[in-house]
Amino acid sequence: MTRHFGALIPSTNTTCEIEYSHLLPPEYQAHYGRMMSSSPTKSPFSSPLDADLDYQAKLLGTAKVEMVMLVQTSASLHSAGYDAEVTKRMEAASGVAALTSATAITRAIKALKAKKVALVSPY
């Protein structure tokens, strides 16, 4: 049985879809919503991205996904409490559970009971 999830990404992101298609097990399928990004070189998370979030989450919800994720780590730096706020907004708009990158990372570290974590990033 194929499991479907939605991923919200900036409109300028040209790698996420390719990477996910290579990393996901065959029984998982990702569906994408793009949030408007004025420039890949400006602030990592901006008002135009935030403005598109609810609408794009709603569209993903119509695809009958099981979960919607905000796939942009820098959104965690947008403002204090933004992760919790945006999770509630995505859930309300899509009608399904929602998650942010930072929340997923935190849950994974706790589930693995990791003592040390290393990060490799293109940033």
Where are the regions a protein language model picked out?
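Proline-centered loop/turn at the N-terminus of a beta-strand
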Residues: Q29, V96-A98, K116
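An alpha-beta-alpha
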Residues: K115-Y123
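N-terminal glycine-rich anion-binding loop in soluble enzyme alpha/beta folds
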Residues: M1-Y55
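Glycine/small-residue-rich loop that forms an oxyanion/phosphate-binding "nest" at active or ligand-binding sites
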Residues: A57-T103
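Gly/Ser/Thr-rich loops at beta-strand to alpha-helix junctions
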Residues: I9-T14, Q72-A80, P122-Y123
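Hydrophobic alpha-helical segments within soluble ligand-binding/sensing domains
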Residues: D52-D54, A98-K113
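Short active-site-adjacent helix-start/loop capping segments
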Residues: S39-K42, S76-A80, A108
